[in-house]
């Protein structure tokens, strides 16, 4: 259908008024369009002429094929008969020809007018449909405006209650002003939403065209999926058989583990009793050694005394012999007096008496020496017996220690086998794995002196996998894939997920995210303190393992290319943490008001990869490069102070590494993705005391976490529609939660009794996540060149 501008003659600015009573063509055109009857009556005299020529009829029938320009119409209207004054026949012929052309022109105008009328009707219909759509959009806008008004009224009620509580404080006026400003912003936002509805209408039309194109591609994909489904059914039957085998092996492993644990406990008891006996034997040995030393010293003293007595006796005997010799000489010597003889006799008697006393003492010392020697022999025999028993006990202890080491080694191997079988079962079931970690009590915790609310089961089945929370006297038991108590180190935590991180190098999509209330230790678990080697978090340790493993696989012909990106979702706005243009506080204000200069868009391609437009991507080849990027991202991330946490994360942090591996010898290529996510913590306004910007951040965080909860509940119920688009966080995590990825969730809880309610909510959410079956992850391998663009899974 020709448009109105195409049928309208062009207007010349130099055209003068001429013909038909001096009325210009444009004016006459305007008058004619006001009523159809007036325009048709203008040439009624011409139309009533009795023209019966066949050529006239043919000309009128062919008028629809003739187009007139403005100059031709003006020339036709100004044309006059050129015949002589008395040449009536020629005048009639000329007038007849002019009338024919005028009829053709009139017919052309009538058809153009009909075209315009039809176009007008179409425009009316289009206008009515547009008005209906506009009314519908306006109704939606009014509904949203009413919701915003309800939110505003709730906020006003909160302000009134706060005003009553804080009437004596000077900050009440500022709170009222802040509330009024939020009300104005909400109204402005409602107006913007109303204005954006028109733009959304255009987008819907564009999406409709794109949907038609997708339908064609989806039909082709459906055929391929049918073929793939057949192969999957065959593979599933094989997996079911393997699953039964694995379950039987797991049962045997559990029984062997139970018997090993029983033997281990028996051996530990026997070892403890032997250690007690060894300790008592060592005490007896020490006493015997001390007694032996005292006896040896006593024997030495007695021997010295005996030797001294013997020496004295020998001197006395020699002296007695000398005196006897002198007596004999004196007796022979007649010249000596009897007095001297008596003196010598007395001396001899005293010496003999002293000698007898010395003999008695010597006999006594010999008896004591014999007794001491006997006691020494007995002590030597006791020490020898004790030493023999000690050697036997030591040998038995070594044997028990060797058996204990063997049992512990078997236990470790059994535990590794159990983990491997458990991971295999989980992969076959397609469940999201959940680990729970309890942080230690801090000096600032309010319930530090109250009774503990966290307990760990000691049964064989639940040991290391169960956690009990006590609230208001009620015990709530939970079981997860692994539970870390408050004494668990960063190394122990990473050891449990190291095999999952390794899967990214094998071509799988891996996603690990931390969930919990604010201040429960999520950021410490994911990032830790990189400056302290023993306190590094999962992200630095995962990167170190990936680079070490890639270097080891280099000997097998593998070459890897790694790309990283880091972003945060702050107030439902994506921010690039590695952008060279550092975001300022004014940019944050513009981002809050929805006027940010740079917008990032999340898209999913047909291969299941997720891309974020205009996101900064770095090629990395060392841990040092990534460490500097992590430090840059940590400095750019949004943090703030609340009453619950001095350094509270106010955004969701997403670290992504895409790994592309090529083995030239086998011509095999793999493509893996590692997503490590530190979610912002949920918090209650009554405890965090958030106001102003902190209040907006809290509302945005709780909204996105609520959207994540809705997605998990929909997956758990196996609903047809899963609301991934309700927030940017869930839309970004769609591939990770959609069944094509190995996904692990860390739920962090606080042992503080004042946070028992939040901890219970977190544990219940984690239990629901653990029950979700999202499908079996697939390994991304190919023999073609890979796309080098970064994706999020």
UniProtKB/Swiss-Prot annotation:
GO molecular function per UniProt: ATP binding; microtubule binding; minus-end-directed microtubule motor activity
One cellular component (GO) term of this entry: kinetochore
Localization per record: Cytoplasm, Cytoskeleton, Spindle; Cytoplasm, Cytoskeleton, Phragmoplast; Chromosome, Centromere, Kinetochore; Cytoplasm, Cytoskeleton
Listed InterPro entries: Kinesin-like_fam (IPR027640), Kinesin_motor_CS (IPR019821), Kinesin_motor_dom (IPR001752), Kinesin_motor_dom_sf (IPR036961), P-loop_NTPase (IPR027417)
Family membership: Belongs to the TRAFAC class myosin-kinesin ATPase superfamily. Kinesin family. KIN-14 subfamily.
Keywords: ATP-binding, Cell cycle, Cell division, Centromere, Chromosome, Coiled coil, Cytoplasm, Cytoskeleton, Kinetochore, Meiosis, Microtubule, Mitosis, Motor protein, Nucleotide-binding
Any one GO biological process: microtubule-based movement
Database matches in Pfam families: Kinesin (PF00225)
SMART domains: KISc
Protein name: Kinesin-like protein KIN-14C
Region called Globular, residue ranges: 1-69
Domains as described in the record: Composed of three structural domains; a small globular N-terminal, a central alpha-helical coiled coil and a large globular C-terminal which is responsible for the motor activity (it hydrolyzes ATP and binds microtubules).
Function comment: Kinesin that supports microtubule movement in an ATP-dependent manner and has a minus-end directed polarity. Plays a crucial role in spindle morphogenesis in male meiosis. In mitosis, is required for normal microtubule accumulation at the spindle poles during prophase and may play a role in spindle assembly during prometaphase.
Disulfide bonds: none
Domain Kinesin motor: 431-772
Segments of this protein annotated with the region Disordered: 1-43
Protein species of origin: Arabidopsis thaliana
Coiled coil: 120-375
Main location: cytoplasm
């Amino acid at each position: 259908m020709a448009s109105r501008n195409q049928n309208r003659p062009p207007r010349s600015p130099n055209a003068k008024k001429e013909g038909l009573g001096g009325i210009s063509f444009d004016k006459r055109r305007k008058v004619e369009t006001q009523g159809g009857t007036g325009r048709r009556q203008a040439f009624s005299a011409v139309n009533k002429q009795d023209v019966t020529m066949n050529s006239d009829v043919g000309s009128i029938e062919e008028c629809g094929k003739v187009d007139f320009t403005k100059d031709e119409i003006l020339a036709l209207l100004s044309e006059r008969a050129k015949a002589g004054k008395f040449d009536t026949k020629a005048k009639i012929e000329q007038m007849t020809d002019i009338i024919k052309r005028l009829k053709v022109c009139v017919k052309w105008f009538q058809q153009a007018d009909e075209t315009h009328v039809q176009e007008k009707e179409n425009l009316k219909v289009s206008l009515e449909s547009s008005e209906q759509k506009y009314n519908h959009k306006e109704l939606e806008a009014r509904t949203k405006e009413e919701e915003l008004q309800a939110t505003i009224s709730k906020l006003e009620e909160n302000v009134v209650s706060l005003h009553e509580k804080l009437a004596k404080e000077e900050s009440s006026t500022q709170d009222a002003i802040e509330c009024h400003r939020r009300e104005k912003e909400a109204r402005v936002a409602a107006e913007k939403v109303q204005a954006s509805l028109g733009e959304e209408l255009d987008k819907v039309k564009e999406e409709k065209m794109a949907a038609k194109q997708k339908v064609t591609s989806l039909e082709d994909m459906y055929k391929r999926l049918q073929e793939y489904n057949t192969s999957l059914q065959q593979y599933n039957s094989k997996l079911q058989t393997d699953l039964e085998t694995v379950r039987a092996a797991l049962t045997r492993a559990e029984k062997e583990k139970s018997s090993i644990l029983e033997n281990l406990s028996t051996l530990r008891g026997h070892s403890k009793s032997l250690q007690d006996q060894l300790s008592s034997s060592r005490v007896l040995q020490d006493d015997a050694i001390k007694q032996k030393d005292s006896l040896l010293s006593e024997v030495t003293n007695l021997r010295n005394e005996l030797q001294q007595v013997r020496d004295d006796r020998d001197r006395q005997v020699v002296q007695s012999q000398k005196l006897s010799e002198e007596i004999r000489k004196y007796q022979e010597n007649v010249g000596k007096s009897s007095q001297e003889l008596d003196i010598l006799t007395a001396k001899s008697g005293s010496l003999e008496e002293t000698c007898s006393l010395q003999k008695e003492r010597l006999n006594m010392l010999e008896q004591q020496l014999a007794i001491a020697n006997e006691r020494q022999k007995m002590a030597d025999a006791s020490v020898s017996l004790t030493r023999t028993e000690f050697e036997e006990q030591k040998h038995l202890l070594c044997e028990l220690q060797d058996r204990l080491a063997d049992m512990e080694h078997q236990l470790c191997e059994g535990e590794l086998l159990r983990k491997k079988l458990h991971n295999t079962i989980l992969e076959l079931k397609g469940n999201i794995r959940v680990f729970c970690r309890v942080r230690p009590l801090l000096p600032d915790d309010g319930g530090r002196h109250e009774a503990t609310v966290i307990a760990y089961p000691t049964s064989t089945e639940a040991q290391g996998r169960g956690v009990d929370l006590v609230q208001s006297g009620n015990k709530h038991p939970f079981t997860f894939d692994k539970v870390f108590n408050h004494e668990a180190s960063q190394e122990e935590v990473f050891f449990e997920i190291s095999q999952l991180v390794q899967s990214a190098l094998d071509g799988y999509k891996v996603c690990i995210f931390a969930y919990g209330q604010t201040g429960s230790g999520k950021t410490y678990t994911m990032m830790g303190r990189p400056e302290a080697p023993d306190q590094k978090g999962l992200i630095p340790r995962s990167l170190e393992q990936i680079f070490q493993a890639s270097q080891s696989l280099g000997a097998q012909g593998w070459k890897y290319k790694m790309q990283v990106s880091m972003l945060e979702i702050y107030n439902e706005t994506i921010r690039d943490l590695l952008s060279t243009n550092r975001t300022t506080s004014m940019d944050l204000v513009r981002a809050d008001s929805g006027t940010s200069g740079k917008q990032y868009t999340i898209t999913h391609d047909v291969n299941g990869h997720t891309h974020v437009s205009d996101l900064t991507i770095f090629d990395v080849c060392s841990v040092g490069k990534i460490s500097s990027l992590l430090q840059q991202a940590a400095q750019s991330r949004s943090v703030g102070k609340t009453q619950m946490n001095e350094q509270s994360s106010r955004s969701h942090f997403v670290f992504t590494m895409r790994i592309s591996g090529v083995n030239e010898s086998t011509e095999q290529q793999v493509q893996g993705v590692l997503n490590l996510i530190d979610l912002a913590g949920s918090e209650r306004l009554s405890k965090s005391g958030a106001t102003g910007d902190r209040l907006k951040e809290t509302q945005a965080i709780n909204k996105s976490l609520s959207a994540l909860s809705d997605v998990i509940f929909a997956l758990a119920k196996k609903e047809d529609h899963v609301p991934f688009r309700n927030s940017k966080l869930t839309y970004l995590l769609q591939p990770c939660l959609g069944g094509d990825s190995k996904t692990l969730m860390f739920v962090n809880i606080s042992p503080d009794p004042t946070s028992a309610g939040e901890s219970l909510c977190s544990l219940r959410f984690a239990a629901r996540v653990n029950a979700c079956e999202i499908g079996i992850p697939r390994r991304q391998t190919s023999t073609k060149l890979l796309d080098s663009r970064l994706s999020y899974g």
